[in-house]
Amino acid sequence: MRLLSFVVLALFAVTQAEEGARLLASKSLLNRYAVEGRDLTLQYNIYNVGSSAALDVELSDDSFPPEDFGIVSGMLNVKWDRIAPASNVSHTVVLRPLKAGYFNFTSATITYLAQEDGPVVIGSTSAPGQGGILAQREFDRRFSPHFLDWAAFGVMTLPSIGIPLLLWYSSKRKYDTPKTKKN
């Protein structure tokens, strides 16, 4: 009997602990390459896996200093009144890196109320980690189609192909006899 009452009490405590909102948040870079002077797209996804709505949800990302990144569109500090249970929200920010080099993309902070009269819950998003921001010149050197380089290569190879062709053609024309027609 004691064991049964202990099990019931433990199950009741577990169900009480799981009540309320529970948010899972992720932060991801959508660009394949981060390039100095080009747009860098960040996406924040917040999922409510709890049993009630999350209230006063605030996402704050202070990991992008203004001297290293310019904001093209979106905001790094966002607030939602509520996120319903079993639903999600997404937020996208477009930044422009101002300097090349390595940068540590750290996690953003998320705060919310799990229940209406409950304490403020503080959490973090996932962190993409350290990534390299390529210089514009390096990116162009690696990934541009190099039309001018190929045109210069073609012009430089023309003499080595064209001169023997002209010599052969003039020799062929000189020593080739035309066929006479018979009527």
Swiss-Prot record:
Membrane topology of this protein: Single-pass type I membrane protein
Keyword Ribonucleoprotein: no
Regions crossing the membrane: 150-169
Pfam families the UniProt entry points to: TRAP_beta
Cysteine pairings via disulfide bonds: none
Cell location: Endoplasmic reticulum membrane
Keywords: Endoplasmic reticulum, Glycoprotein, Membrane, Signal, Transmembrane, Transmembrane helix
Cytoplasmic side of membrane: 170-183
Protein role: TRAP proteins are part of a complex whose function is to bind calcium to the ER membrane and thereby regulate the retention of ER resident proteins.
Protein name: Translocon-associated protein subunit beta
Organism of origin: Homo sapiens
